[in-house]
A protein has these predicted regions:
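Residue-level signature of catalytic and energy-coupling elements of molecular machines
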Residues: 9, 13, 91, 110, ...
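Conserved helicase/translocase P-loop NTPase motor core
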Residues: 105-118
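Flexible beta-alpha connector loops of hexameric P-loop NTPases
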Residues: 95-105, 161-162
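Hydrophobic/aromatic beta-strand patches that form the interior of the parallel beta-sheet core
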Residues: 7, 36-38, 89-91, 154, ...
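Walker A/P-loop phosphate-binding motif and the immediately C-terminal alpha-helix
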Residues: 5-42
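Conserved catalytic-core segment of NTP-binding enzymes
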Residues: 30, 116-127, 132-205
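Short, glycine/acidic-enriched loop or turn micro-motifs at the edges of active sites
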Residues: 42-44, 95, 134, 193
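N-terminal phosphate/diphosphate-binding loop that engages ATP/GTP or pyrophosphate donors
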Residues: 27-90
Length: 205
């Protein structure tokens, strides 16, 4: 499987990365590729556009309900994935209840389970798209980079300073894990105001 079709889309919350990620997954599927779409955000809304606009049960919810957070038991891929439009397999990490636990750890647990189930093995999918919250690039949110599940990193930015601040931190994490073969493929500018001059983003790039 070509790692060129395995993309991690990072960005500040509300920047539009889920829309861009789901469009990427749809584009790959329309090309006849077998696609896995992985939402790595506690809001678990990455797959909304792929499953008729309904929030799917998250990995963390299913995992805790069926097997508990430490025991994979007889967990099957079908237990944690939902078939979306165009045959895209969808999974959402979800997160803990507010004030309890770490959302980044939830992402790591999900990826560990997918790996144990063989979902992330080479040859399983033609394309894998990870939609990852980038406000805080802790070890959990950086798991797709750290564990080498994808090489190509795309950062969604806007003209807002906090979006560029988050992008700068994400770029630093890409550099940290560059020994795994990950690289920054580029920025996607999703402007809040289409009339705004793009000079700030161009200078940042």
């Amino acid at each position: 499987m070509s790692m060129q079709n395995n993309i991690v889309v990072f960005g500040k919350g509300g920047i539009g990365k889920s829309t861009i990620s789901s469009n990427l997954s749809s584009l790959y599927a329309l090309q006849g590729l077998k696609v896995l779409h992985v939402g790595c955000d506690p809001k678990h809304d990455s797959t909304l556009g792929l499953v008729d606009g309904e929030l799917i049960e998250t990995f963390m919810e299913k995992y805790a309900r069926i097997f508990g957070v430490r025991d994979h038991g007889e967990l099957k891929p079908s237990d944690i994935m939902v078939k979306g439009r165009l045959g895209i397999d969808c999974v959402e990490a979800g997160g803990p209840e507010p004030g309890v636990g770490c959302a980044g750890r939830g992402i790591s647990l999900m990826l560990e389970a997918l790996q144990d189930l063989g979902v992330l093995k080479e040859g399983g999918y033609d394309a894998r798209v990870f939609d990852v919250l980038g406000d805080v690039v802790c070890g959990g949110f950086a798991a797709p980079l750290r564990k080498g599940f994808a090489e190509k990193i795309v950062i969604v930015v806007s003209e807002e300073l906090m979006a560029l601040y988050a992008a700068n931190n994400i770029a630093k994490s890409v550099k940290t894990y560059s020994s795994n073969g990950v690289y920054l493929a580029g920025l996607v500018a999703n402007l809040k105001d289409g009339k705004v001059e793009r000079g700030r983003i161009e200078r940042f790039a």
